[in-house]
Amino acid sequence: MVEQVAQDEGLAPSFSPERIKQLERETRRDSIGRAWYKFSRNHLSVIGLATVILLVLLAIFANYVTPYPRHAGAFTDFAHAKISPDAQYWFGTDEIGRDIFTRVIFGLRSSLLMAVLVLTLVVPPGVLLGLLAGYYQGTWIDTVIMRVTDIFLAVPPLILALAVASVLEPNLWNGMMAVSLMWWPWYTRLVYGLGTQLRNEYFVTAAELTGARTSHILFREILPNTVSPILTKMSLDVAWVIIIGSMLSFVGLGVQPPEPSLGTMIADGARYLPDQWWIAIFPALAIVVVVLAFNLLGDGIRDMFATEEI
């Protein structure tokens, strides 16, 4: 009634705090709906999302969904060694009688765990350094941060990871540290490029004129406008981290036996190609599926945040 009277008198309607919160919730729901519509238009991205969810659930509940959980550890059964895929052993068995399907699922768990931990370690510092360098462009802060970043980017990522992993004791955690050391500069470079563009936008200038603190400008004004490229890169980087981690395990510098690793399984199975092909092929196919799924998911996230062109 008040809103109607205000409109009749040519005045702007006044809203109660509850009404404002309701409008904010409705706007948020509309934004989520539009984002999902953009994402779902790409059917391959939906398939990628469904595949990623399935793989994550399999990895989390590996102890319950695999037929032979004991085969993920130090288990031997030479009487059932090198059995080809059948109804009992879906992916066959390896050279010492362990179920390959079980070990692939547990190896998938190790790979996803490494990817999550690596991104957790590298994204915050990489983004923070990129924000600082971008906002203070042209100062000594920018120079120091970006020169150090360039040094790391100048070294091939795999070579750097191999060098670090070879110095440390080979295991999952040290492999993770080796990959983390080579990955943060990419986020610094990404956010730096975005920050140099955003620092001259009107909303940043307005915040500076009102006396806002630097932390407010960085984390409340600039950072929210870099979220979509960061999320897109993270979804694509999961696949790359898994590939690098598998390479480290392949050369013996990652996850160590008897703990299953997709890279180690491929290395062990390569000795039995082409006769016992299943020992190496199924772990390799698992990597292909994971990489493809996360790349499709990344494409969908990019489309979801894409600005409509008029």
PLM features per residue range, with description:
Residues 39, 57, 151:
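Residue-level signature of catalytic and energy-coupling elements of molecular machines
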Residues 44-63, 127, 288:
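Short, strongly hydrophobic transmembrane alpha-helices
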Residues 43-53, 95-310:
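Alpha-helical transmembrane segments of integral membrane proteins
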Residues 2-10, 58-93, 253-259:
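Hydrophobic alpha-helical transmembrane segments of membrane transport/permease proteins
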Residues 55-56, 74, 223-224:
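Short secondary-structure capping/turn micro-motifs that flank functional sites
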Residues 23, 90-98:
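Dynamic helix-loop-helix/coil hinge segments at AAA+ ATPase domain boundaries and subdomain interfaces
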Residues 1-50, 296-310:
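Transmembrane alpha-helical segments of polytopic membrane transport and secretion proteins
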